[in-house]
Amino acid sequence: MSYTPLPNINDFPTLGNPLEDAKRAAAYRAVDENLNFDEHRIIGVGSGSTVVYVAERIGQYLKDEKYHDKVSKFICIPTGYQSRNLIQDNGLILGSIEQHPHVDIAFDGADEVDHNLQLIKGGGACLFQEKLVSTSAKIFIVVADSRKKSDTNLGINWKRGVPIEIVPSAWSRVQHDLTSILHANSAPVRQGGSAKAGPVVTDNMNFLIDADFGEIQDPKALHEQIKMLVGVVETGLFIDNAHRAYFGKPDGSVEVIDKK
């Protein structure tokens, strides 16, 4: 291991993309301000484009002589295939939630965050593992760019619906119940796109439905109603889970919001 001084975010050249600069600024600051090298050992590493910079920043601490001994003992818990690769690519120790069910701190992104730090997650099809890791953590920190912040309710900026992980054989039943009982505007099964025929299959071998409820006034009540439907594994509504959120802006500044 060759040691290098920990790079300061202000010394980095631009990535050439204001959005990526915003994501990096949010992620680096979140790690710098919340990772406790004396108390934290089990670290949750989430999924998504902003979390790339979380893993990168922790990896930079690993290469710094001052922090190496402590960071080398961190065990990082992934939420999916992407985060597993991020952990390994940055030289960090890979663990599992089965081996380490009690997580000290977790970092993850979000598709939308409302004024109460309620979240929509699951656009990347990892919502069950993301919720398992984040709810197992003593501290859950959200990192995102400012497009993901809603000053009012969920469903304002994120227009793709609430991701819902379902048992494959129940897709028709759940789809019907979402539209007829819970009055979703639509509830399509997420498809794999041009590279894959048929539905997206999660890491848990389930399907996903993206249910459009428009603006969500009461995300906790909606989450509970969806969970009661037979065939639903988990929803992408993360309720009273996040402790703090970091939103990177294109000008390089970062807005920090704490749970009220």
From Swiss-Prot:
GO terms for biological process: D-ribose metabolic process; pentose-phosphate shunt, non-oxidative branch; pyridoxine biosynthetic process. CDD domains: RPI_A. It comes from the Eukaryota. The keyword Cytoplasm applies. GO terms for molecular function: ribose-5-phosphate isomerase activity. GO terms for cellular component: cytoplasm. Pathway: Carbohydrate degradation; pentose phosphate pathway; D-ribose 5-phosphate from D-ribulose 5-phosphate (non-oxidative stage): step 1/1. Keywords: Cytoplasm, Isomerase. The keyword Cytoplasm applies. Its EC number is 5.3.1.6. It is found in: Cytoplasm. It catalyses: aldehydo-D-ribose 5-phosphate = D-ribulose 5-phosphate. Belongs to the ribose 5-phosphate isomerase family. This is Ribose-5-phosphate isomerase.
